[in-house]
Amino acid sequence: MSAAEIKTNANQKMEKSLEALKTNLVKVRSGRANPGILEHIHVDYYGNPTPLSQVASLGLADARTINVQPFEKTMVAAIEKAIRDSDLGLNPVSQGTVIRVPMPALTEERRRELTKVVKSEGEDAKIAVRNLRRDANEHLKRLTKDKEISEDDERRATDDIQKMTDKAVIDIDKIIAEKEKEIMTV
């Protein structure tokens, strides 16, 4: 593996870490309704736990209400139960074939708890990025030791990987700041 391949590989993995962070943050509830928070809920569908997004369409009725439209009318009760049993503190209301999920306003205390969760997710993402940097640098050192690349190439590649790491950490900080602002906005 060449130094360029190591840099490309590290960059791709850092991008995946950022995407994973964004995916995890969608699940953290803010004051606004977001259908993404319901996607990880599993519904009992003929004896099989099935993701909610596969048995119903999710949409927004307004800024504080999510509409859940089951594909089968018989699923209304099971979906309602799954949402109620989730640890999100939501209370779905059935209106015939549509389930409305109003998002209760967050208390100040709950907002602070959620910002701590968001910061923790951000720290986990930074740790993942730094581990990727360490792995790439170790790989470069092995190549230098085995005389496959020169020390100058190693130094250049190490500097490039550090720049990628710095950029990824800045991006993580921006994502976290945006989510915290979203949570703290009443």
UniProtKB/Swiss-Prot annotation:
Matching entries from PANTHER family are given as:
MITOCHONDRIAL RIBOSOME RECYCLING FACTOR PSEUDO 1, RIBOSOME RECYCLING FACTOR
Reading the lineage from the top rank, the first entry is Bacteria
Read off the Gene3D superfamilies from this record.
3.30.1360.40, Ribosome-recycling factor
Write out the annotated subcellular location.
Answer: Cytoplasm
What is the organism field in this record? Answer: Polynucleobacter necessarius subsp. necessarius (strain STIR1)
What name does UniProt use for this protein?
Answer: Ribosome-recycling factor
UniProt GO MF annotations: ribosomal large subunit binding
Q: Which NCBIfam families match?
A: frr
Which keywords appear in this protein's UniProt record, sorted alphabetically? Cytoplasm, Protein biosynthesis
> What GO terms fall under cellular component here?
cytosol
